């Protein structure tokens, strides 16, 4: 016997982890399966909250499970799914075609993400500091995303946590594939695409009546948490040019901060025309004040 393998076989096993893995395998195909996955992840690193979502390219994500921390519950249930998900780094990574794997927020977030309004609203304001996502790609247009989170009361995830999660990832991904094969028919019955079509229309048409196409590209990078330097790199131009575009955006939209821009973008989503080319900002601004207050 290879002495290296002998040593590995003699390593002590964590009985709690083994029990959690056994429960996860036994629960494949059941409604409680995602709970058992979170229990497994909670055995290898500290987890304050977490959940699972089904990502779609052509419709809004579907929440399967979310174990909230108390502060997260202070947000309306649909606060994320009503549109802001389009700015989520993991959702954007999914749209870009990333492979199945483990993704740490600090590795994939844009360089100014932690100063963005999105991070303030959906992380720090509700007490979160960090997250790790385990994404399994079903096909080009769909993926299952399992996520775990840390609160601001505790230290962010560390490299040792990621090593442990990545060690277990092949087992979890294999179990995910089996679970999906048994439950796919039920998942496909969810077909509400209206919100996602409105979100996509807002991304494509927001402020088109006031801004140039390049300014609108810069705007989306702004609210996604990209710095001027990284935006310039993505758009293959200079940082100085991007800064000029940013000034023009603030002037044309009569806003003074990223918080105002983020808020305006979100408020315009209900006024977007699905699959259309109408500027939702123009519709929003022309709507009666009472109608705007309801969004």
Regions found by a protein language model. Name each.
Residues 201-208, 250-295:
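Basic, Lys/Arg-enriched C-terminal extension of HTH/homeodomain DNA-binding domains
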Residues 166, 220, 233, 251, ...:
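A cross-family signal for key residues in well-ordered alpha-helices
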Residues 4-12, 16-32, 36-142, 147-153, ...:
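Regulatory input/activation interfaces that engage signals or partners
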Residues 214-218:
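The N-cap/first-turn positions of alpha helices
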Residues 222-226, 265:
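Short helix-to-turn junction characteristic of helix-turn-helix DNA-binding domains
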Residues 225-260:
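Recognition helix of helix-turn-helix DNA-binding domains
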Residues 176-193:
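Short alpha-helical interdomain "coupling" segment at the junction between an upstream regulatory sensor module
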């Amino acid at each position: 016997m290879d002495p290296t393998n002998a040593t590995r076989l003699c390593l002590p096993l964590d009985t709690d982890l083994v029990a959690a893995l056994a429960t996860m395998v036994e629960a494949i195909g059941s409604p409680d399966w995602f709970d058992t996955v979170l229990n497994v992840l909670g055995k290898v690193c500290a987890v304050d909250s977490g959940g699972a979502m089904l990502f779609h390219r052509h419709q809004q994500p579907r929440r399967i499970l979310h174990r909230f921390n108390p502060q997260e519950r202070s947000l309306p249930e649909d606060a994320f799914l009503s549109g802001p998900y389009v700015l989520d780094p993991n959702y954007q990574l999914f749209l870009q075609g990333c492979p199945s794997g483990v993704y740490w927020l600090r590795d994939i977030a844009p360089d100014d993400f932690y100063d963005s309004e999105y991070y303030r609203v959906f992380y720090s304001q509700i007490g979160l500091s960090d997250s790790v996502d385990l994404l399994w790609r079903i096909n080009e247009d769909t993926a299952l995303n399992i996520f775990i989170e840390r609160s601001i009361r505790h230290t962010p995830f560390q490299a040792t946590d990621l090593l442990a999660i990545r060690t277990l990832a092949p087992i979890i991904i294999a179990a995910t594939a089996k679970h999906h094969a048994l439950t796919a028919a039920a998942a496909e019955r969810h077909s509400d695409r209206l919100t996602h079509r409105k979100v996509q229309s807002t991304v494509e048409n927001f402020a088109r009546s006031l801004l140039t196409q390049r300014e609108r590209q810069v705007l989306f990078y702004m609210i996604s948490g990209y710095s001027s330097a990284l935006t310039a790199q993505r758009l293959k131009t200079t940082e100085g040019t991007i800064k000029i575009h940013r000034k023009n955006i603030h002037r044309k939209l009569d806003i003074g901060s990223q918080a105002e821009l983020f808020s305006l973008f979100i408020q315009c989503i209900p006024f977007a025309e699905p699959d259309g080319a109408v500027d939702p900002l123009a519709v929003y601004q022309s709507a009666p004040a009472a109608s705007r207050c309801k969004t």
